[in-house]
Amino acid sequence: MEELLPDRQVWANMDPEERMLAAATAFTHICAGQGEGDVRREAQSIQYDPYSKASIAPGKRPTLPVQLQYPHVESNVTSETVSEASQRLRKPVMKRKVLRRKPDGEVLVTDESIISESESGTENDQGLWDLRQRLMNVQFQEDKESSFDISQKFNPPHEYQGISQDQLICSLQREGMGSPAYEQDLIVASRPKSFILPKLDQLSRNRGKTDRVARYFEYKRDWDSIRLPGEDHRKELRWGVREQMLCRAEPQSKPQHIYVPNNYLVPTEKKRSALRWGVRCDLANGVIPRKLPFPLSPS
């Protein structure tokens, strides 16, 4: 506190208003170095964060007061520290988000990320705490060496003016990640897995057995539960067709066929033999036929 204040001679020659301004500036430097005194930050930490439940690391991570770097502010120590911190945080992590839709149309987004063992536990918390202490020391040294005001030191762009340092860091990280905000709101704490492995004993015991009836009813239940919009129920459609078939008018009776007897007699061998026998008898008795089939020609 004494190092940030001016000398005793200058302090004695200053007006009360200038003394208050210098004390307030020094106090602001100290609060900025320790990350305290920001009411909006405390209110933001109390608010409910739905993404914290589905975050990769368990528990609440400590806030890192990272020093913002702009073109007119140069610091080799801070850049080396930030690069070292980024290398430490870059660990093999498989990020995976699964989107599911329930039969009622509700959307469920779950985070199934896989983390390494070194990133979880007390080691991660201890490393983050050490990194926070180093950054706080570097920032305090820079505040002690600098002689210009905080308003001149931090000159963010026009669209980021009027917000605190932590909010500016969060907004920049959000823009760098590019993840939409509505996905974070849909993440829940249950986190069901996308695939559940079957038990080995059941798999080996029921490998050769397949209940076709149970499989049919299972598929039928799934088919009935998941329907396309505008699809008619097949059972109702079948019953409607059956009612139309039953209500159809009866066909007209066809006219009966009238039987006409046939008097035609087919000549048989018996009748021909009787005719031949009669002709033979007439020739033997000298009886002339009544009508000749052809005229007799004179000989």
Curated annotation (Swiss-Prot):
Main localization of the protein? Answer: cytoplasm
Q: Is Transmembrane found in the keyword set?
A: no
Against InterPro entries, the record matches this protein to:
Centriolar_ciliogenesis_assoc, HYLS1, HYLS1_C_dom
Highest taxon in the source lineage: Eukaryota
Keyword Translocase attached: no
The UniProt keywords, alphabetically, are: Cell projection, Cilium biogenesis/degradation, Cytoplasm, Cytoskeleton, Phosphoprotein
* Any single Gene Ontology cellular-component annotation: cilium
Q: Phosphoserine occurs at which residues?
A: S179
Location in or out of the cell = Cytoplasm; Cell projection, Cilium; Cytoplasm, Cytoskeleton, Microtubule organizing center, Centrosome, Centriole
The cross-references to Pfam families, in alphabetical order and at most eight, read: HYLS1_C
Q: One biological process GO term for this chain?
A: cilium assembly
Its biological function? Plays a role in ciliogenesis.
Task: Give the family, as the similarity comment puts it.
Answer: Belongs to the HYLS1 family.
Q: What is this protein called?
A: Centriolar and ciliogenesis-associated protein HYSL1
Question: Lineage, please?
Answer: Eukaryota, Metazoa, Chordata, Craniata, Vertebrata
Protein encoded by which gene: HYLS1
